[in-house]
């Protein structure tokens, strides 16, 4: 996801950023999804002592809900 965001930034640098809101939406979608995936991996990791009481199903449900909210906000930003 981060590599896709970097490709989008490079493309914007080469071609231009005429529809700037769609560029921002694409980059924020990539970065937001990467951050949510890292949070899911931290919560599901069995070696992590901080989230021992959290079941993996709850962590995955949080990931899905936050991803849904993220993409609804991005779709709203696109107009």
UniProtKB/Swiss-Prot annotation:
Pfam families: DAD. Residues 1-19 are lumenal. Pathway: Protein modification; protein glycosylation. Residues 41-58 are cytoplasmic. It is found in: Endoplasmic reticulum membrane. It comes from the Eukaryota. It is a multi-pass membrane protein. The keyword Ion transport does not apply. Keywords: Apoptosis, Endoplasmic reticulum, Membrane, Transmembrane, Transmembrane helix. One of its GO terms (biological process) is protein glycosylation. The keyword Cytoplasm does not apply. The chain crosses the membrane at residues 20-40, 59-79. Belongs to the DAD/OST2 family. Component of the oligosaccharyltransferase (OST) complex. Subunit of the oligosaccharyl transferase (OST) complex that catalyzes the initial transfer of a defined glycan (Glc(3)Man(9)GlcNAc(2) in eukaryotes) from the lipid carrier dolichol-pyrophosphate to an asparagine residue within an Asn-X-Ser/Thr consensus motif in nascent polypeptide chains, the first step in protein N-glycosylation. N-glycosylation occurs cotranslationally and the complex associates with the Sec61 complex at the channel-forming translocon complex that mediates protein translocation across the endoplasmic reticulum (ER). All subunits are required for a maximal enzyme activity. PANTHER family: DOLICHYL-DIPHOSPHOOLIGOSACCHARIDE--PROTEIN GLYCOSYLTRANSFERASE SUBUNIT DAD1. This is Dolichyl-diphosphooligosaccharide--protein glycosyltransferase subunit DAD1. The gene is DAD1.
């Amino acid at each position: 996801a981060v590599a896709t965001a970097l490709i989008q930034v490079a493309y914007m640098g080469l071609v231009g950023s005429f529809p700037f809101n769609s560029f921002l939406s694409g980059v924020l979608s990539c970065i937001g999804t990467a951050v949510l995936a890292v949070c899911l991996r931290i919560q599901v990791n069995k070696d992590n002592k901080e989230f021992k009481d959290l079941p993996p199903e709850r962590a995955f449900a949080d990931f899905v809900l936050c991803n849904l909210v993220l993409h609804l906000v991005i779709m709203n930003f696109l107009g």
